[in-house]
């Protein structure tokens, strides 16, 4: 079945779930065991389901052309105030309960050799370092240090200080130290690690699955796609100004050189769509990695050879007696 048809089928199933949830008594709440220790009433359940419908409407797209074909009017309708979540939809992590801890968070937030990719941090750079890194032959790339007014990346004290969300590893004397291993090359080397949630976030406390920030920025994208940039501006500025301490964007974009953030890969100032994507990646860095991969493929930004979609699991294929296949590399279904 074509993936677009499957996405539409999934949306219809979720819409049926919304209709059924609305028939429940107003005092209905989900059992605490369903979403570990979360009190979710009927109306909140509907808002969560609406969020998943929005995801289904948007994230199926594999290409820029398909992303443009999304029903953005319906996205606007579903992301209107009152229709989507107003607090994080999360799961309480508990090492004694299977399925509540996050191995992905553990591996991406490790304070030893887990790092934030340079392509995540790089667009914040105003020094030109990131553009020089992009122009460096792939095998010769290594870590870089950016300079940025975005206080989520580094502090006001300069590029060696920690930001609100990212920091640089140091030894007991406070000296920067690189602990990534060279066995796989230095291409993936980065100075930056996530510090927003601490080292035990993957197994302690609330692990967000969906955020109001995601819904607000999808709404901003809908406004941009429908030719209403003025309506997108305040949604982009919510986190940009409050958390990044960056100047607000306007309908004309992110400002002018040399201080604009984010920048495009060629070093020019980003437009509103760039600013929206940048906010989404920085703010939701630890929420559902599939979101960022889906965004990047639909904007044509995946690195060459990356898989564009997931194959059917090998075990399923074996049960069905079908040949094993995959995507990525030079296979069909790979990013050009």
Regions found by a protein language model. Give the residues of each.
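Acidic/polar-rich alpha-helix caps and helix-coil junctions
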Residues: 1-115, 152-153, 157-336
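C-terminal amphipathic alpha-helical segment
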Residues: 118-163
């Amino acid at each position: 079945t074509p993936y677009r048809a499957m996405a539409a089928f999934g949306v219809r199933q979720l819409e049926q779930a919304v209709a059924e949830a609305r028939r429940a008594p107003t005092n209905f709440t989900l059992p605490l065991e369903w979403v570990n220790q979360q009190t979710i009433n009927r109306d909140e359940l509907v808002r969560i389901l609406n969020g998943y419908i929005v995801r289904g409407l948007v994230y199926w797209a594999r290409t820029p052309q398909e992303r443009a074909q999304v029903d953005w009017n319906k996205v606007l309708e579903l992301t209107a105030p009152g229709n989507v979540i107003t607090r994080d939809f999360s799961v309480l992590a508990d090492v004694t309960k299977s399925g509540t801890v996050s191995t992905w968070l553990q591996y991406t937030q490790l304070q030893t050799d887990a790092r934030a990719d340079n392509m995540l941090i790089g667009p914040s750079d105003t020094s030109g370092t990131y553009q020089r890194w992009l122009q460096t032959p792939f095998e010769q790339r290594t870590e870089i240090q950016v300079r940025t007014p975005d206080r989520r990346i580094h502090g006001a004290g300069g590029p060696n200080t920690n930001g609100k969300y990212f920091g640089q590893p140091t030894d007991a004397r406070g000296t920067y130290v690189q602990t990534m291993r060279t066995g796989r090359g230095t291409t993936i080397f980065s100075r930056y690690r996530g510090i927003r949630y601490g080292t035990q976030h993957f197994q302690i406390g609330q692990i967000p699955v969906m955020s109001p920030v995601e819904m607000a920025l999808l709404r901003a994208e809908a406004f941009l796609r429908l030719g209403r940039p003025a309506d997108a501006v305040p949604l982009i500025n919510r986190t940009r100004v409050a958390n990044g301490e960056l100047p607000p964007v306007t309908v004309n974009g992110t400002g002018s050189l040399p201080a604009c953030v984010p920048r495009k890969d060629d070093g020019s100032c980003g437009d509103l769509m760039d600013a929206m994507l940048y906010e989404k990646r920085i703010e939701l860095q630890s929420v559902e990695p599939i979101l960022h991969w889906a965004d990047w493929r639909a904007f044509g930004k995946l690195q060459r050879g990356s898989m564009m979609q997931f194959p059917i699991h090998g075990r399923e294929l074996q049960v069905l007696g079908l040949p094993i296949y995959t995507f990525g590399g030079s296979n069909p279904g790979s990013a050009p």
